[in-house]
Amino acid sequence: MASTRIREARESDCGDIMRMIRELAEFEKLSHQVKISEEALRADGFGENPFFHCLVAEIIPAPGESQGSLVVGYGLYYFIYSTWTGRNVYLEDIYVMPQYRGQGIGTKIIKKVAEVALNKGCSQFRLAVLDWNKKAVNLYKFLGAQDLTESEGWLSFRFEGEAMRELAGR
């Protein structure tokens, strides 16, 4: 029987990760917002000073099966800093291919990110989810995450493109 393992991504995984980034964006109805390329992903995550870290979920075939291993999910994260609580980790993306959902793979990725965070001395593990993605919302709550919009009233903002250039005076 095939098994699943969660491991650190390698540079050679960038094609699979980029494919899944596009699949996630399509699922979120935001595919028009994906601007990065596989080359940018490779440079930003696997250079001397990576901007992010990534885990992949890999299906390992049972002994005697002819197919090779298959990357079916990923979790892309980075470290941030809170002036209130110190070191934190932020899970930017978590994705499992639809045909592999419901097998606990997403939970394994989340647990591995939590393990990494604790090993790095982080006090919090943060992530965001679209409000209509009820399966993900329910999973995060089941795993013990707190909805900060509900409990503390936090809203999330971003500056991008022209607004960011204008703000910087460029």
From Swiss-Prot:
GO CC annotation terms, alphabetical: cytoplasm
CDD domains tied to this protein: NAT_SF
The entry's keywords: Acetylation, Acyltransferase, Cytoplasm, Transferase
Enzyme class: transferase
Active site residues according to the UniProt entry: 140 (proton donor)
Modified residues (N6-acetyllysine): 29
Any one GO biological process: nor-spermidine metabolic process
Family: Belongs to the acetyltransferase family.
Source organism phylogeny: Eukaryota, Metazoa, Chordata, Craniata, Vertebrata
Compartment(s) where it occurs, according to its Swiss-Prot or TrEMBL record: Cytoplasm
GO MF entry, a single one: N-acetyltransferase activity
Organism listed in the record: Mus musculus (Mouse)
Subunit-level organization: Homodimer.
Pfam families: Acetyltransf_1 (PF00583)
Protein name: Thialysine N-epsilon-acetyltransferase
Described function: Catalyzes the N-acetylation of the amino acid thialysine (S-(2-aminoethyl)-L-cysteine), a L-lysine analog with the 4-methylene group substituted with a sulfur. May also catalyze acetylation of polyamines, such as norspermidine, spermidine or spermine. However, ability to acetylate polyamines is weak, suggesting that it does not act as a diamine acetyltransferase in vivo.
UniProt binding sites for acetyl-CoA: 94-96, 102-107, 133-135, 140
Ligand binding (substrate): 27-28, 92, 152
Enzyme Commission numbers on file: 2.3.1.-, 2.3.1.57
All copies of domain N-acetyltransferase, residue ranges: 4-166
Chemical reaction(s) catalysed: S-(2-aminoethyl)-L-cysteine + acetyl-CoA = S-(2-acetamidoethyl)-L-cysteine + CoA + H(+); an alkane-alpha,omega-diamine + acetyl-CoA = an N-acetylalkane-alpha,omega-diamine + CoA + H(+)
Chief localisation class: cytoplasm
